[in-house]
Amino acid sequence: MSRSETLFASAQTHIPGGVNSPVRAFRSVGGTPLFLKHAEGAYVIDEDDKRYVDYVGSWGPMILGHSHPQVLDAVRRQLEHGLSYGAPTAMETEMAELVCRLVPSMEMVRMVSSGTEATMSAIRLARGYTGRDAIIKFEGCYHGHSDSLLVKAGSGALTQGVPSSAGVPADFAKHTLTLAYNDLDEVEATLKEKGEQVACIIVEPVAGNMNCVPPAPGFLEGLRRLCDAHGVVLIFDEVMTGFRVALGGAQAYYGVTPDLSTFGKIIGGGMPVGCFGGKRAIMERIAPLGPVYQAGTLSGNPLAMAAGLTTLELISRPGFHDELGAYTSRMLQGLQDRADAAGIPFVTTQVGGMFGLYFSGADDIVTFADVMASDADRFKRFFHLMLEGGVYLAPSAFEAGFTSIAHGDKELAITLDAAERAFAKLK
């Protein structure tokens, strides 16, 4: 019995499902989740001392690779001064100034402790600013686990939301309209009928929670136009894409400016953190300036600020994101070549340093339906074959993968060697 198996059995006694976030349980792929004890560079090491090339990256934050020495040094220096103060710090202001400089749409910013807090607060702010209750989100997009966002589409584009988690009252869900991602016509029709009720549209500019689905040409631009026409606040959820697909996030990559944005993951350098911000006129509605309440005991935690500031400074060097994207492209092309050689229907998607893998014969992946039509059972087999080969992919056919600047030629060779053997066994 492996150490991970022993630990997982023990964990299930006191932790629901043995994990503190559902995807970690390996329910989508089967088997026992890896229990990790160390990480360095492009690698994670499990409790049985096996090393894996890591394409999960703690679900996105580790863009520099694990245990980057300059990030660790920054955290150690802060440790000498205390863990948490519950009071303003100079680093919070420094972080706010840096974020506003890197992301010009962010005229003001509020720090929080998670991406869920950031999206929840941004939606509350949009509702307070507009005086409207309804929100629009998109099928397959995930914005954290707050009640009004755990909603799936009903039996039609204009059907009111239905809770997709037990414990979410129908009265919460009824204000959430869930539409098809990349279907601008559906958004236009919905706003034509209900626009005066809609406070905001929240969207992942690259849908990273149904694998990795880029926006169709004109989709984000169309959302901007429709929001302007109907007085709706446009929120980009950049918890995943922020500072990863480009230094200025997906809004810089695609050239579309939202009213509010949410960030997390990279902004904390691996520490628990998030933020939301945007137009000054909207942000000034937040307490203590305005009537929209938001607060947090650990918001702006100094350890998180130290790690985040150092991370953002390091990824700001010229050429960083070009290098990250180039490695990702080489890796994906290598996977595609080996799948083609084995006669396996396979397609990939990429935006910068995030990517998607699909066992599908489709020419492209554009919609939630395209994702759901891919062969999830074949992905399960591929996942475990890659794991045997020393490569750790996201343990779900519906999650994006992430590269880091620590990935290089050695990691590429390990990855493609494992993939060649895996595809051969999948024939």
UniProtKB/Swiss-Prot annotation:
Q: Which GO terms describe its molecular function?
A: glutamate-1-semialdehyde 2,1-aminomutase activity; pyridoxal phosphate binding; transaminase activity
Where is it mainly found? cytoplasm
Catalysed conversion reaction: (S)-4-amino-5-oxopentanoate = 5-aminolevulinate
Keywords assigned: Cytoplasm, Isomerase, Porphyrin biosynthesis, Pyridoxal phosphate
Coiled-coil boundaries: none
Per the UniProt entry, the Enzyme Commission number(s) are 5.4.3.8
Q: Which cysteines are joined by disulfide bonds?
A: none
One biological process term in Gene Ontology: protoporphyrinogen IX biosynthetic process
Q: Where in the cell is it found?
A: Cytoplasm
Q: Which Pfam families match?
A: Aminotran_3 (PF00202)
* Keyword check for Isomerase: yes
**One of the record's GO cellular component terms:** cytoplasm
SUPFAM superfamilies xrefs = PLP-dependent transferases
* Modification N6-(pyridoxal phosphate)lysine, positions: 265
Cofactors, names only: pyridoxal 5'-phosphate
The pathway noted for it is: Porphyrin-containing compound metabolism; protoporphyrin-IX biosynthesis; 5-aminolevulinate from L-glutamyl-tRNA(Glu): step 2/2
Q: Which family does it belong to?
A: Belongs to the class-III pyridoxal-phosphate-dependent aminotransferase family. HemL subfamily.
Q: Tell me how this protein assembles.
A: Homodimer.
Q: Which NCBIfam families match?
A: hemL, PRK00062.1
Protein known as: Glutamate-1-semialdehyde 2,1-aminomutase
Q: What is the native source organism of this protein?
A: Stutzerimonas stutzeri (strain A1501)
User: What is the name of the gene encoding this protein?
Assistant: hemL
